[in-house]
Amino acid sequence: MPLAHGGMANSNYSCANCGNITSKWAGRCEACGEWNCISEDIGLSQGPTRSSLGKSRGNFIPLDDLKSSDKPLVRTKCDLEELDRVLGGGLVPASAILVGGDPGIGKSTLLLQAAAKFAVKGLKTLYLSGEEASSQVKLRARRLNLDETPIKLGSDTNLRNILTTLEKERPDLAIIDSIQTIWSDKVESAPGTVSQVRAAAHELTTFAKRSGTSIVLVGHVTKEGQIAGPRVVEHMVDTVLYFEGERGNQFRILRSVKNRFGAADEIGVFEMTGLGLQQVTNPSALFLSTRGIPSAGSCVFAGIEGTRPLLVEMQALVSPSPHSQPRRSVIGWDSSRLAMILAVLEARCDIKFSGLDVYLNVAGGLKITETAADLAVAASLISAKENIIIPEDFVFFGEVSLSGAIRSVGKIENRLKEAEKLGFKKVESPTNTKLVKGLNIEVFENLDLLSFVNKLSNGIKKIKTENLN
């Protein structure tokens, strides 16, 4: 146990794993359960005292006066259209961006490519690495054919040195890789701790607002998928991006979860190749290109990610369970939502899944959070259990309630247009789905899940797998 510090009655202790703050030291964090992760939180200054305040307490501008003085928001675009989309249309000056992702997922590769694109566009770009030497970054740039681009490289972990460099160079864009390696001599804790991460993020964000430099901070994520360090860092910055993907899958998803200058929940799709990350401008066609011959348990969901319509394949497998407690396994969707759909199918439609293992997968490594996927999940589960092949020209969307009703969802026109563009002819959707003029697509409306199940079993031109031969 650490020794008590005299004269510090207001000391706090924080967890290095989750950022939870307590008033006293403990061996185990009560929030996340990790051991030996509590340390004293030597925070930043609490601000000036009343006696030290100046005569001027702040400058205020009337809101109506901003019309004449405020300039339109200027954005700088790069040739990576997927990145521009996620940023809300381009890079905004004086913005602070936090990019998180698993180790080895491709964060540094993406940002090095982006830095090269912005440098070619005329932005003075500085890439500071706290994890690699400048020569190592140079080798990585050479592998990506970026070694001739006008990027300035640096390698340092001391916050004072980094701020001095930024003050001297005054770049348009500075990339700090990563925030967990930066340490400040004003904070008495090890690099990567909650106090150090918060202090570094505060100083760098303040510099961005004061100087007009756009700052990109790279952050590691915890095993729960959250950016490591205190959540206050996400509140400091303007934009929070997550770089997602599976190690064995070539696709990567750049997802915006916060953006003060654009739409949140926007995604950009990239493919990892030997020459770095290549953008995927039509992800729906790419995700469905490997679908192959339709099989039982497979159907297509017409979804929306941010402002982008996206068609993905939902795959389900239902088999007898050899265990006393059947298994429910989900990849790419919410497991609690799957449990709810199974319960509604049993209670409202009399389709029993007890004694059966259920597996659900979103093809392509995507993570779907939309409740509009409920109907597609129900269709794939019924198809898998009843051994029915759904015709390949069908797409599905709709939210399922606990009563079994199928509720309407948003952005229906975008879903229908994307489905028709990729050759789909029929849509199973909720009631009150407005037809879009000029679209050659047939819409089948569904009031509740029971009528949908009956239609799927009897009236959708089903093909039993035993009759395929």
Where does each model-flagged region fall?
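Conserved RecA-like ASCE P-loop NTPase motor core of nucleic-acid helicases/translocases
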Residues: 125-129
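Peripheral, non-AAA+ core regions of ATP-driven protein-machinery
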Residues: 5-17, 21-87, 92-100, 105-112, ...
